[in-house]
Amino acid sequence: MAAKLMHAIQYSGYGGGTDALKHVEVAVPDPKSDELLLKIEAATLNPIDWKIQKGVLRPLLPRKFPTIPGTDVAGEVVQAGSAVNRFKTGDKVVAVLSHATGGALAEYAVAKENLTVARPPEVSAAEGAALPVAALTAHQALTQFANIKLDGSGERKNILITAASGGVGHYAVQLAKLGNTHVTATCGARNLDFVKGLGADEVLDYKTPEGASLTSPSGKKYDYVVHGASGIPWSTFEPNLSEAGKVIDLTPGPTAMMTFAWKKLTFSKKQLVPLLLIPKIPNFEYVVNLVKEKKLKTVIDSKHPLSKGEDAWSRIMGGHATGKIIIEP
């Protein structure tokens, strides 16, 4: 049985950064019929978490205040709703919680059965918790938008991955190489060797003239760009794209949406495509299995106890994490 109260981190309004995070004791949530109550073993943060706090998606998210942030968790099922049939008490799982409700920075959380997958013993809680948003975003960008076959059977393509040392980026490099693509990647100078070690064929320091211009050292034009960085205008991408090259924007803002619309209206072959993550169980199970088979690795930037969750929040806000930031109750 779960305890009646749990430790959690909340914030009660927009803005404030780490100073607005409060450690509280709150009631353990009750699962609905299609939900699981999880005892959290590890959670991870994504940039969208602090952006929601900042108010980027107001008034849509969060749905109410106070809110417990975070969506990516691994844990053990301690209670299953009456309509749940894929899991039982004691099962180890990985889940993505709704951004509308959050809940990851706590000792317990409720997860929808249809957003939860089994975690095999070969995958640690930290490795599992790191996957949902970051690995699924990379997977969706490459398979749905770039049409890459991750078994390597498709036509060889040239891919650019920006912010390649971050959460999404480090998965995207590995998945793209499974798909037999030529990968050019950008990152900071301190991470050049790290990104090469993930399998990238060419790595650019984004602060150098070559990196800032996104020019392939071998002169290749990019069929697809998996774009997770910020502040790069369309005019920088366009001359580096192949005839029908596409930029897949993982964090589209108003300018990106205007570019997307304009390129559609003018029937341009070169396109900017905004990505909205749609988690799907088969994809979720696929990336977990890749970790199990040691074909995909989770690189952990740092681990923090829940009692020092504000340190993890500060780290994700800084924007320079290498891999994933883990919080453990």
Curated annotation (Swiss-Prot):
Belongs to the zinc-containing alcohol dehydrogenase family. Quinone oxidoreductase subfamily. GO terms for cellular component: chloroplast inner membrane. It comes from the Eukaryota. It is found in: Plastid, Chloroplast inner membrane. This is Quinone-oxidoreductase homolog, chloroplastic. PANTHER family: ZINC-TYPE ALCOHOL DEHYDROGENASE-LIKE PROTEIN C16A3.02C. Keywords: Chloroplast, Membrane, NAD, Oxidoreductase, Plastid, Plastid inner membrane. InterPro entries: ADH-like_N, Chloroplast_QOR, GroES-like_sf, NAD(P)-bd_dom_sf, PKS_ER. The lineage of its organism: Eukaryota, Viridiplantae, Streptophyta, Embryophyta, Tracheophyta. Its EC number is 1.-.-.-. GO terms for molecular function: oxidoreductase activity. The keyword Membrane applies. It holds the Pfam family ADH_N. Neither the N-terminal nor the C-terminal are essential for chloroplastic localization of the protein. An internal region (59-Pro-Ala-100) is essential but not sufficient for plastid localization. The transit peptide is not cleaved.
